[in-house]
Amino acid sequence: MSRHKVYKAISSYVIIAIIIIAIVAVVGVLLLTRHPSSSSVTSTTTPTTSSSVSPSSSGPVIVYVAGAYKAIFDYLAKQFEQQTGITVDVVPGGSFGLAAQIAKGQPVSVFVPVAYIQAVELEGNRDPGWAIAFISDQMAIIYSNYTTQSPYWNQLYSNYTMAMKTNESQYWYNFFYLLTTKFSLGISNPSSDPEGLYAYLILKMAGYLYANHSFDYFINLVNHNPNVVSAPTTADFVPDLATGKLDFTFSYVSYAISQHLEYLKLPPWLSFGYYPNETSWDSFFFYKITVNGQTLKIYGNPVYLYITIPVNASNEQGAIEFVEFIVDHVQELSMFGVTPITHPLLFYQNKSDVPSQILNLLNQGVLQYGGNFSAV
């Protein structure tokens, strides 16, 4: 074979080899583009947003809590984060208003309404069907040192002290009459905030007891007092109380303590504290509220703080751990002026709705069964 032919054959083989290498390289690039490595997926994937709520096992634990108890949950969140490393975001507001937000699909892990278990049912299709009552509180009439400078303060306070000492109806009548006509008074919206609902129930009780069984007597006085103001939550009144622009509001004892405000304690039959002898009396009174276009007749009951996990909760596993943590640390909360329930009460509509971890606490005797929602 001549040198020219050999050279031509070698050249042909080289060209074929180059073509094969090029084809392999192109195919390899295409495969890498279509099938990135697992480490590439982890580093480049970003969460997508959706209008529907779906459960998640990561991210912070988002706690929707009745606004008066924000200080308690700021404390619990810090302790929980230190113990588990899981971040907790505390979102305060009126219980009924928060329930409405949850029903509309807002992301939330844990819901902590106060006073009325109906707030759990107002979550709509995210109602989990269960809740735990873990502390009790009671209503009081809140004020600041500025209030004591009012020209009617001495008259009001003397009637209050005599009423608490003697329980004579005339002193109580004088007290509530002065409160509702001679002072500026903040009452939160009863359709968004249970504190406002309790305020109107207390006024109905006072009218029935001290104004010839007239349920609406003191409510009518409030409605005709131009110095009575409303707000979505009681927290909205705190700045004006602290600066003397507002004289009084109705709130929980624990909230007054957490805000370093003064308060007038109410007797058991007006405070909605957990007094077993008063529960049937409390439930004799009702007030109508409207939430999401729905009118509800709400009967009086003790001030409980509930905790539950809505359906399709964000970071559901973290939410369960947070609930377990609270049950385990409930006795610590007495420093906030509330009464811990030694064996918190588990309420549910159907046992099958309750997470297995929560049922285990019931079976172990850590929780006690409180009944279905209608029992509250």
Curated annotation (Swiss-Prot):
One of its GO terms (molecular function) is molybdate ion binding. One of its GO terms (biological process) is molybdate ion transport. The keyword Chaperone does not apply. Residues 37-57 are annotated as: Disordered. Pfam families: SBP_bac_11 (PF13531). CDD domains: PBP2_ModA_WtpA. Keywords: Signal. Residues 1-31 form the signal peptide. Belongs to the bacterial solute-binding protein 1 family. WtpA subfamily. This is Uncharacterized solute-binding protein STK_20340. It comes from Sulfurisphaera tokodaii (strain DSM 16993 / JCM 10545 / NBRC 100140 / 7).
